Amino acid sequence: MNQRTDPSTLPPSDTELAKHNGLSATLPFALVHVACFAAIWTGVTSEALVVGAVLYVVRMFGATAGYHRYFAHRTFETSHVGRFLLAWLAQTGAQKGVLWWAAHHRIHHQRSDQPGDVHSPVTGGFWHGHVGWIFDPELSPTRWSRVRDLARFPELRFLNRFWLLPPLSLALTVLAIWGWSGLVVGFLWSTVLLWHGVFTINSLAHVWGRRTFDTPDHSRNNPLLALITLGEGWHNNHHHYMLSTRQGFRWWQFDITYYVLKVMSWFHLVWDLRAPPAELMRAQVRPAVAVLTPAQPSAVLR
């Protein structure tokens, strides 16, 4: 896994597969939701509920620490093995490959709530910002030019291409150990909840909450969303300084993902966790704006 590839030899554009990939994303997404009703026949056991709760929390950490804070923003460092394991864990949540995810998220930050933002509820409507953008054929290809720093690693390109391998492996493992109830209630239910939990940051966190910082978008801080996403709900903080590993800037802004990463750093599993500069915090903070009031963008933070 230590082998690196020259960025000039990145895979060719897969734009020609966009239409097919858009359909291939829509159908499984719908089927997973429908399959959740199979619990009528499999039953709902306490064991399956525990499995589902554990899978939700662990895979939410994979999404927040993996997809978002590491691959999209590189807010901390880890080893080659750690990078692969983070990618695998993130992809067990079935939100496509880490390179695809990171590329589109970087576009979001560059054009947040402006024309060209891939999932803004402000410019594209709530449904598009929440989930509809995933099914847009034009957004199906991986934007390789956005992730040249990550696409050097062949193991990440492999996982990005075969992005269903981690979630399918997990699903089969759950089925083998806990049976059909474990698969439906433990895996499928937690997967649907995980999806929509993550999606709320793209949608609700741009329309519902309080603004602590003047950012050039409509991002909000929302403690409820922070609770269900292990800390991602401090979204206005994040858009104020996206390079910070910790998104709960204040001591009372709980950020479970950061706490876990901090503990991992004690064992040298991750390192170089980043914090917002003190002068940035002092210079930009202002009284919070009331819930659901329109944001007034100011200067762009580069």
Where are these regions (language model features)?
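Non-catalytic, topology-defining segments of multipass membrane proteins
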Residues: 1-200, 204, 244-302
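Active-site-proximal inter-transmembrane loops
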Residues: 147-154, 208-234, 239-241
